[in-house]
């Protein structure tokens, strides 16, 4: 069974869902995690995501990556909401996340 994960980076929290896809195309959630980091509060008046906010996000993503490795996840999908879409340095953030 293939195992995949979704990471949702929101303005207030980062969520992880790990699931397995069964042969009949159904899926089962294996693990869920959530960290509240209030990423939106690290956006400056000019919509720049401050370095300390980025550092906190990267720490959470490293933890989530290690959880995914323990579950033998073959693919991780990352989506981001308002705080990331609005930030003028989102390309830098995306490169660091990769």
Go through each PLM region and give its residues.
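Nucleotide/phosphate-binding catalytic cleft detector across ATP-hydrolyzing
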Residues: 1-9, 17-98
């Amino acid at each position: 069974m293939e195992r995949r994960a979704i990471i949702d980076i929101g303005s207030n929290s980062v969520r992880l869902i790990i699931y397995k896809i069964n042969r009949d195309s159904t899926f089962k959630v294996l693990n869920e995690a959530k960290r509240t980091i209030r990423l939106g509060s690290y956006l400056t008046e000019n919509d720049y995501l401050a370095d300390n906010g980025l550092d906190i996000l990267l720490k959470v993503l490293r933890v989530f990556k290690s959880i995914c490795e323990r579950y033998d996840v073959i693919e991780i999908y990352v989506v981001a909401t308002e705080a990331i879409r609005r930030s003028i340095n989102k390309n830098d953030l995306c490169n660091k996340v990769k």
